[in-house]
Amino acid sequence: MLALRLLNVVAPAYFLCISLVTFVLQLFLFLPSMREDPTATPLFSPAVLHGALFLFLSANALGNYILVVQNSPDDLGACQGTSSQRPQRPPPSTHFCRVCARVTLRHDHHCFFTGNCIGSRNMRNFILFCLYTSLACLYSMVAGVAYISAVLSISFAHPLAFLTLLPTSISQFFSGAVLGSDMFVILMLYLWFAVGLACAGFCCHQLLLILRGQTRYQVRKGVAVRARPWRKNLQEVFGKRWLLGLLVPMFNVGTESSKQQDK
């Protein structure tokens, strides 16, 4: 339990550090290298377009991250403890989280990177957080590849060029041919690639469970759920204003997921 609580503190700090490092690299390395194009117009220069797109992806990723933390699931155990009525039988999807020490409705899993449980209240923000984190990481990787290609005069036309970049760069770094800053960017390329793929896979997995009307806890425990139309399952999680929530981080308003009780 001590290890889990320690991980619950280290993982959010790790995510925030990676986000800060990514922002610094974009601001002080990638964007200045794009301003050197004299043929581009000031309004539609690559630096302006790249900066606007990166800020959009980062703002949505961090905004939904904050909403996941703020909109933590309600503690049903505390509500039943303060109620004077006879406690009802909890729905099959409720679960007691040992890390958070509370009972949550439609518990899916505990996310250590947010330090919070994922349930009915913050599921949509969690999925959008995974989506935009994946896009921001993969986009940063593409920008980093362009930067390394220009600085080190490396061609990535060959399919295996990215796979052989790390071992080749390590040997050149110890021989003095590659600077420490460039080596750090190369290491970040692989980190962005790994985090981007992991978040994309997790986002797709969560969407598949939502289409089926299930949670990870229900799948793990073998709890049977009532068959419902997939569109209704999506609406309960994303609400009627799903398009606005896709563009701007916002609280999941207008859904019935927090009021749903499993049969």
UniProtKB/Swiss-Prot annotation:
GO terms for molecular function: protein-cysteine S-palmitoyltransferase activity. It comes from the Eukaryota. The active site is at residue 111. The chain crosses the membrane at residues 10-30, 48-68, 126-146, 147-167, 183-203. GO terms for biological process: protein localization to plasma membrane; protein targeting to membrane. One of its GO terms (cellular component) is endoplasmic reticulum membrane. Keywords: Acyltransferase, Endoplasmic reticulum, Golgi apparatus, Lipoprotein, Membrane, Palmitate, Transferase, Transmembrane, Transmembrane helix. Residues 31-47, 204-263 are lumenal. Residues 1-9, 69-125, 168-182 are cytoplasmic. It catalyses: L-cysteinyl-[protein] + hexadecanoyl-CoA = S-hexadecanoyl-L-cysteinyl-[protein] + CoA. InterPro entries: Palmitoyltrfase_DHHC, PFA4/ZDH16/20/ERF2-like, SSD. Residues 91-131 form the DHHC domain. Coiled coil: none annotated. Its EC number is 2.3.1.225. It is found in: Endoplasmic reticulum membrane; Golgi apparatus membrane. It is a multi-pass membrane protein. Belongs to the DHHC palmitoyltransferase family. Interacts with CNN3. Palmitoyltransferase that could catalyze the addition of palmitate onto various protein substrates and be involved in a variety of cellular processes. Catalyzes the palmitoylation of KCNMA1, regulating localization of KCNMA1 to the plasma membrane. Might also mediate palmitoylation of CNN3. The DHHC domain is required for palmitoyltransferase activity. This is Palmitoyltransferase ZDHHC22. It comes from Rattus norvegicus.
